[in-house]
Amino acid sequence: MRRLTVVQLLPALDAGGVERSTLEIAEALVDAGHRAVVVSAGGRLLPRLEALGAEHRALDIGRKSPLVLRHVRTLRTLFREVDADIVHARSRLPAWLGWWALRGMGGKRPHFITTAHGLNSPSRYSAIMARGERVVCVSRTVRDHLLAHYPATDPSRLVVIPRGIDPAAFPRMPHPDRAARARIAGMHPQLEGEGPLLLLPGRGTRLKGHTDAIALLAALRGAGTDARLWMPGMVQAGREAYVRELVEMTRRASIEDAVAMTE
């Protein structure tokens, strides 16, 4: 088996499905004997990435500024330095930078792959996610979205690989873990109780369905069920206005003492 070098491009390594998928692919590559290189601005998941045996190159390729164009040459140099076989872009701006870097390489160039993790607003800027030699779509909905808005895309290049979870990290239990519930309630008193605990992990974006979860909780509590709602991952820099909006929604529904929004 020939050892491959795969370079993944993304803005940062803080939290979210893109970041988790990046770590999972890096781990799979290393376990299979390949070389995994990740380019990002870094973040709290960086120690976990490096513990997997992957390499990280710090480069702020997600900052929306004209100055980011200077990273095209840096990426081109990096691709040559590591002798990249595959460049895998997971976000729009990093994808554009990687695309431009590859276009300036003479001779044999690395293959260019993208993963469309969501339903980006249709535009020339977003179209880069459909330009990969192979485009990984995390759902059939994402595949249909790309084909509908970028009809020139060859459907044979799109591959649906649904996102999933590691069952070892999220094991099924025959009954609720009361000790775990008590620990969580100790950190977030709003979650204390014996009733159902609703969990909605995800970044603070409207696509995640936070308002629907709050409406569901309000209906359950209105029907007499002592349900609680935990939304981890949504409290992030730049999401403050959205969080305030949701807090106000819980207040209007008189359920603010049964909801925890956390990092």
Segments and roles (model prediction):
Residues 141, 164:
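Carbohydrate-associated surface elements
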Residues 171-190, 245-247:
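A short helix/loop element that forms part of the nucleotide-sugar donor recognition site in Leloir-type
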